[in-house]
């Protein structure tokens, strides 16, 4: 065992002495060391209940002959960080979390890990760190929040964001907005729709890194506690059998996850996180081109928020991820999982599917997969749109560019009534390095939707979007403006042509004009001069490479 390096032999008496200072007995020190990576915090609703899951996981570890050691990582709430300087820290926090997991596990000789994340960047961050170590681990995702209810209608956080736009154009009163604000998020859990947190939980289960039904089981359900306890027991088995992530994860495992993502209409942020996870195994293991190739393989089979009407709680009652895998069975490749069962064995155990929630592939919600990769002279290295959340009339759009160099400028223009039907809003210098931090543009997109412009106005950016964004929102444009990408030379009034079905996005000027503008472009200074974000801006890769540090 790895832990033998710090606890065996006479020379390790000082190490054992310090462990005994923590209250551990000789018998406990002899057992496998299991790190319990808890991201509990009192400021993130998706994480306020994680202490309960950590306690259950520790009981499971003890029950199966291991010794648990709990430690914490940070957790950022994207919703609370939204719309201000805090959002610069959201995506970069993923790398801090990965480094924390790596550092703590290496420093203390853990033989295996139980990861307990919930929200957007914490799920991929923890997994990235664990993959880097290549030691046995299992993931307990925190679980979804229930939707709120008011006057017989269901709400979630996106309802509140869009409510701001509705209030601004007089559709609702301030009192009605306050009612929605108060009811929309009723308690613990990651936001109730198929936004980034729940998308990543679903893909974690598909990858075989968490137990079946973990992703969709509600945050405070007793079954989630039982899953946590069983996960604690299972990690001891994985350590004793020396089953590492590289024994489980293959190219096919990642392709399964992408297929589920595309079929469900998951968050566009998955095109950052899945390549970033794969990068920890091998560079170029999974790229944006894999998403592009696979998006023609499956239709969109679930009408989940933000593009549809159903919530993750509905997906759970419909059969969860095993049911989705069952419906996609002809496309899914077999792979091993931490449960000890293969993907095909999990599929064969499915007993119930609600086809009103998870549609058969021959009767899909949309014939087109939920995400689409576009390329063109604006985005030579690609960009992404969550097409499942786009009105079909906007699949093809051509209009004049309204150019802004920050999110703040854009919001002022939208709420000030300066954006008109037919416009293409361009937000640049918001990429991984340009932001820095690649902020989510949820406030601008929600304002556009709330004001009723989502069926006539497109928005493109080198930044990214919340998993809760809907409408014709095209993000991750690569190369980003800060790297001298063509988005940097778009001028006010230029005509932009978007054709989602053809996978194209182009600036309607000549190649000669593009070359001339690029030759005259001057790189601006980094917006943040000190601290972590300034260092991040110097090291981060392009969005089409997962925005990893290199």
From Swiss-Prot:
Annotated keywords: 2Fe-2S, Amino-acid biosynthesis, Branched-chain amino acid biosynthesis, Iron, Iron-sulfur, Lyase, Magnesium, Metal-binding
N6-carboxylysine, modified sites: 121
Entry EC number(s): 4.2.1.9
One GO MF term attached to the UniProt entry: magnesium ion binding
Pathway(s) where this gene product acts: Amino-acid biosynthesis; L-isoleucine biosynthesis; L-isoleucine from 2-oxobutanoate: step 3/4; Amino-acid biosynthesis; L-valine biosynthesis; L-valine from pyruvate: step 3/4
Residues involved in Mg(2+) binding: 78, 120-121, 440
Enzyme class: lyase
Cellular component, GO annotation: cytosol
GO biological process, one term: L-valine biosynthetic process
KW Lyase (keyword) present: yes
UniProt catalytic activity: (2R)-2,3-dihydroxy-3-methylbutanoate = 3-methyl-2-oxobutanoate + H2O; (2R,3R)-2,3-dihydroxy-3-methylpentanoate = (S)-3-methyl-2-oxopentanoate + H2O
Pfam families (alphabetical): ILV_EDD_C, ILVD_EDD_N
Co-factor remark: Binds 1 [2Fe-2S] cluster per subunit. This cluster acts as a Lewis acid cofactor.
Cofactor dependency: [2Fe-2S] cluster; Mg(2+)
Gene3D superfamilies in alphabetical order: IlvD/EDD C-terminal domain-like
Superkingdom of this protein's organism: Archaea
Binding site for [2Fe-2S] cluster: 119, 191
Active site per UniProt: 466
Family statement: Belongs to the IlvD/Edd family.
Protein function: Functions in the biosynthesis of branched-chain amino acids. Catalyzes the dehydration of (2R,3R)-2,3-dihydroxy-3-methylpentanoate (2,3-dihydroxy-3-methylvalerate) into 2-oxo-3-methylpentanoate (2-oxo-3-methylvalerate) and of (2R)-2,3-dihydroxy-3-methylbutanoate (2,3-dihydroxyisovalerate) into 2-oxo-3-methylbutanoate (2-oxoisovalerate), the penultimate precursor to L-isoleucine and L-valine, respectively.
Assembly with partners or alone: Homodimer.
Record protein name field: Dihydroxy-acid dehydratase
Lineage: Archaea, Methanobacteriati, Methanobacteriota, Methanomada group, Methanococci
Name of the gene this protein is made from: ilvD
């Amino acid at each position: 065992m790895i832990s033998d390096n710090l606890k065996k032999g006479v020379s390790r008496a000082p190490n054992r002495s310090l462990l005994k200072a923590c209250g551990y007995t000789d018998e406990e020190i002899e057992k496998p060391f299991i790190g319990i990576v808890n991201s509990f915090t009192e400021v993130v609703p998706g994480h306020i209940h994680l202490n309960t899951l950590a306690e259950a996981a520790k009981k499971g570890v003890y029950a199966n002959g291991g010794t648990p050691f709990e430690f914490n990582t940070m957790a950022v709430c994207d919703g609370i960080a939204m719309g201000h300087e805090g959002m610069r820290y959201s995506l970069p926090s993923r790398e801090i979390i990965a480094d924390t997991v790596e550092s703590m596990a290496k420093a203390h000789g853990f033989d295996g890990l139980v990861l307990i994340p919930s929200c957007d960047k914490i799920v991929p961050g923890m997994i990235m760190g664990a993959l880097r170590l290549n030691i046995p681990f299992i993931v307990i995702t925190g679980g979804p929040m229930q939707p709120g209810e008011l006057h017989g209608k269901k709400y979630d956080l996106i309802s509140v964001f869009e409510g701001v736009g509705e209030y601004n154009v007089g559709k609702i009163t301030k009192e009605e907005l306050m009612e929605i604000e108060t009811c929309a998020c009723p308690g613990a859990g990651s936001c109730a729709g198929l936004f980034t947190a729940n998308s990543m939980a679903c893909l974690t289960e598909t990858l075989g890194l968490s137990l079946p039904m973990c992703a969709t089981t509600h945050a405070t359900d007793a079954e989630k506690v039982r899953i946590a306890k069983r996960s604690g027991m299972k990690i001891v088995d994985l350590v004793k059998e020396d089953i590492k992530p590289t024994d489980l994860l293959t190219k096919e495992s990642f392709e399964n996850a992408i297929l589920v993502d595309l079929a469900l209409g998951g968050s566009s942020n998955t095109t950052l996180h899945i390549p970033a996870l794969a990068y920890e195994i091998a560079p170029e293991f999974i790229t944006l081109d894999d998403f592009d190739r696979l998006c023609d393989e499956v239709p969109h089979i679930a009408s989940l928020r933000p593009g549809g009407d159903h919530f993750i709680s509905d997906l759970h009652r419909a059969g969860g991820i095993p049911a989705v895998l069952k419906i996609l069975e002809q496309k899914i490749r077999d792979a091993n999982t931490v449960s000890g069962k293969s993907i095909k064995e999990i599929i064969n155990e499915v007993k119930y599917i609600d086809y009103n929630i998870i549609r058969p592939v021959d009767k899909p919600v949309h014939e087109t997969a939920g995400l689409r990769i576009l390329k063109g002279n604006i985005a030579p290295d690609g960009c992404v749109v969550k097409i499942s959340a786009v009105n079909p009339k906007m699949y093809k759009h051509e209009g004049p560019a309204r150019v802004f160099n920050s999110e703040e400028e854009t919001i002022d223009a939208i709420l000030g009534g300066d954006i008109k039907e037919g416009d293409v809003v361009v937000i640049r210098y918001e990429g991984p390095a340009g932001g820095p931090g690649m902020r989510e543009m949820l406030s601008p997109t929600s304002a556009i939707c709330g004001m009723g412009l989502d069926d006539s106005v497109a928005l493109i950016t080198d930044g990214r979007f919340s998993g809760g964004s809907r409408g014709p929102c095209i993000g991750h444009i690569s190369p980003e403006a800060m790297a001298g990408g063509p988005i940097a030379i778009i001028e006010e009034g230029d005509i932009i042509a978007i054709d989602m079905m053809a996978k194209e996005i182009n600036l309607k000027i000549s190649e000669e004009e593009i070359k001339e503008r690029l030759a005259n472009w001057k790189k601006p200074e980094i917006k943040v001069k000190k601290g972590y974000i300034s260092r991040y801006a110097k090291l981060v890769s392009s969005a089409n490479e997962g925005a990893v540090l290199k």
